[in-house]
Swiss-Prot record:
Natural source organism: Dictyostelium discoideum
Recorded GO MF terms: inositol-3-phosphate synthase activity
Name this polypeptide is given: Inositol-3-phosphate synthase
Biological-process GO terms, alphabetical: autophagy; cell-substrate adhesion; inositol biosynthetic process; mitotic cytokinesis; phospholipid biosynthetic process; regulation of phospholipid metabolic process
Positions of NAD(+) binding: 70-72, 143, 179-180, 190, 193, 230-233, 281-282, 306, 309, 340-342, 355, 393-394, 422-423
Catalytic reactions on record: D-glucose 6-phosphate = 1D-myo-inositol 3-phosphate
Amino acid sequence: MSAQMFESFKVNSPNVKYTDEHIISDYTYQTTKVQNVNGELIVEPVDQKYIFKTERKVPRMGVMIVGLCGNNGTTVVGGVIANREGLCWNTKQGLQTPNYFGSVVMSSTIRMGMDENGCDAYIPLKNLIPMVHPNDIVFGGWDINNANLADAMQRAQVFDYDLQVQLIPHMKNITPLPSIYFPDFIAANQKDRANNVLTGTKKEQMEQIRKDIRDFKESNKLDTVVVMWSANTERFSSLVPGVNDTIENLMAAIDRSEEEISPSTLFAVASILENTTYINGSPQNTFVPAVVDLAIQHNVSIGGDDFKTGQTKIKSVLTDYLVSAGIKPVSIVSYNHLGNNDGKNLSAPQQFRSKEITKSNVVDDMIASNNILYKQGEHPDHVIVIKYVPYVGDSKRAMDEYTSQIFMGGHNTIVLHNTCEDSLLAAPIILDLVILAEVTSRITMKKQDDDQFATFHPVLSLLSYLLKAPIVPKHATVVNALFKQRACIENIFKACVGIAPDNNMLLEQRL
């Protein structure tokens, strides 16, 4: 039976109400509570009634990218311009048309149910609840290099030449704002690019970033702004008592230009103080405890860490499959080489260490889920190597070897080779992150007996699907398994319109 595709839908239920301003849904959340009682697992099914309220008006949104003139920044902006203007270009494969492939928001569908003939019905994810369209986003941002976006796009060598020629008139007048540059935090080989930097104390530079955000919002008549870090990977910041452990200590440390206050931390603090969502697309520990506490205090959304594009996304799928199948991965070896500026920066040991940490942790929750395969504290050998090879440019090569124990002492080895067009994979993820972060700000919910609606926790774990090392609220579970992360997005948005999660039981076809 073939699937049916629809662009829109109507929910026929007394539990869903559409007003001019809101979608209001009465939703029964079914979950399971467990207790360990004297070594016995007691399982209790729980039904909890919630009310979801989603604002229908889509705001005029701007995105400010830190690292605007990098490969990711130019690819995002150029890709959106090509889609908005309908630019087509020729390659040796023929005429190419713009699209948003690789975006879960723009190019994926969700199953809504089954008709009387057993045919599944799907709609685009972007049509489930009102969302910002990428074509309507206003872009700006900062960079330590002063190249205009047309020159930076040509330097990146990501787009085909014919498309670059058509984009130049649209991008040549876009220039980056001066950015924060502390040489100690990124590789020394980035110094020759740093010709567009702020000066002054750390407090003065942070205040300038705040002013930039305000000016950008006002000059473009925006309702909301998201700040996205897509700049160089920084080294990890040391967690120092009296410096970045509490809000008060952090603000005082900024006032005295403390050495361990990184550029990304200053951008995060500036964004939070301007009531602006901040997302960290690189692996460094921007979100030190004081920054997280500041976001919670101001109820400003933050998300991170590190875009999940090629190799890591496959790793989270493959490891989940192996462990779920009762197969025991005992060795995971991942090798990468790339030639873009990200690879150049990561060739420095301290910056590589930041990346190594986020890429290593991606299998942890899957390993911990199966104590039949793994004893307490047992973990696969997991090695990550990244090398800089200038000639391959943005075309990152990833090679992985998975060795697993199977039945009766046997071994299975899986070897993968993955050519990742790095920025072409990252750009749609950047769009997904900012669109999903915005839409969550328009969703409030409450338990049926509560008086007040509440927003999502400021630490946006909902974005985990798109990030290598997702940050979550304190004491919350970190989920890295990819399909669980995808189901979370889908099912929360379904709850907003009163639709049950897709449990795949298909009981109507089992009898």
